[in-house]
């Protein structure tokens, strides 16, 4: 049992009665429920939520019966920004600060954490999966790994605190993927699926100095990416298979870029996208699997051997990378504002339905 501690509060009390929107069973209407914060451990904080992004993962829990680690009822939501309003004895330095809550919070002490593999820590905590999530007025989370937000820089970038909630997954997940793949100036980076996470992958790879190829089946998304870092856009409905690879080779040749060691990011989370990504392997290529699907694909695994290529999985992002990812946003190397839209939290049912039906063109952020 966690040790109890003295608790410090910011401005002495909560601004509203804490409440959450609870998922009671897959597909059932979410229910607003008030709750008591309870006593904090020494290392916990209470964050008054400014915004919480709606992610494909949330839709999977709600519509597809993907199992959560925490028993239902549960508040979903893992893309959280807000302000620390209560803090345990060991976390008092966070009181009053604007923060982003990491989507995955490793324990920091196990063998996986100490060897740099914290995102797969077996004792990790994920809001909206392991603990109550951010579709709420307040969340109780470990202080470890919180990412501070410089509010002066935030204002200078023309953003609100709610806006940077999506940094917690939509931005940091592709940031770690780009970092892990070793993208550097002069690389050819190919991003398959440029909605949500993939759209930010394009911007991040471009910020790292790569010539970015964006592939999707949606002309509107491709047009958007042509204005946000993509040097070449390809519609997979019009060009497929070997022709995709030939088009990228032609782009590389025309711009004096390498025909080898491409960095390929599969962000569509579809079987077709994964098959296309594998088909783009070149000598020394790196294939980063960022999107998730239950679809099965059939590939010739020996191509990895023949091309001396590598395939990498990418789960979340280490909390220590969050400040650098946030810097890209605050330095305006990543355009956040054009890809998000805010909705009141009490419209959660309508927003989930619209996101599930692919009626939203931007990532939704729910604000209490």
Curated annotation (Swiss-Prot):
Zn(2+) 1 binds at residues 55, 78, 169. Transmembrane segments: none annotated. Optimum pH is 7.2-7.4. It catalyses: 6-hydroxycyclohex-1-ene-1-carbonyl-CoA + NAD(+) = 6-oxocyclohex-1-ene-1-carbonyl-CoA + NADH + H(+). Disulfide bonds: none annotated. Its cofactor is Zn(2+). Signal peptide: none annotated. NAD(+) binds at residues 56-60, 173, 196-197, 216-217, 221, 290-292, 308-310, 314-316, 363. Belongs to the zinc-containing alcohol dehydrogenase family. This is 6-hydroxycyclohex-1-ene-1-carbonyl-CoA dehydrogenase. It comes from Thauera aromatica.
